[in-house]
Amino acid sequence: MIITTSRKPSQRTRSLVNDLARVFNFKILNRGKIPLSELIENKDDMIIVEELKGNPGRLKIFNFENNKILSMNLSLKLQREVSGKAFKNSGKLGSKFDKNTEHLKEFFFEYLFKKLSNYKEENFEVVITFKTVDESTFYIEVHKGSENMGPSLKIKTVKILDIE
């Protein structure tokens, strides 16, 4: 899976891309002047981190099998802000949903987890936790054991969009 940014990303956006690439073992594509239409034509599974007011503000996960996009508005804390260090996941990755985020499990499996070679249903070393803040907001955090390794994403909205 490829992760990239909108054009001319800020340092904070590039840091988020690097953090996500380390946790999920994504390949980073430095976009430069590549138009979005050209990225979509390749039909490679990808994630685009978009900016709002100079900070990472939206994450779009493309699913070309269904011609859909999982779009999330977010705020975040980077790895260096959460744990003070860069964490590289070299093991198996799993997920854990609380009762209020359980309804999102199939979306994240369909759009993200089933495309990861290191994702396992059990016997994993690193867990992606989904926990509720209130009825409209939840966190996605990366934990190794009981330690939060970062990044920590506060998801404000989740939408399913059509690829045009």
Curated annotation (Swiss-Prot):
Gene3D superfamilies: Probable brix-domain ribosomal biogenesis protein (3.40.50.10480). Probably involved in the biogenesis of the ribosome. The keyword DNA repair does not apply. One of its GO terms (biological process) is rRNA processing. This is Probable Brix domain-containing ribosomal biogenesis protein. One of its GO terms (molecular function) is rRNA binding. NCBIfam families: PRK00933.1-2. PROSITE patterns: BRIX. It comes from the Archaea. It comes from Methanococcus maripaludis (strain DSM 14266 / JCM 13030 / NBRC 101832 / S2 / LL). Keywords: Ribosome biogenesis. Residues 1-164 form the Brix domain.
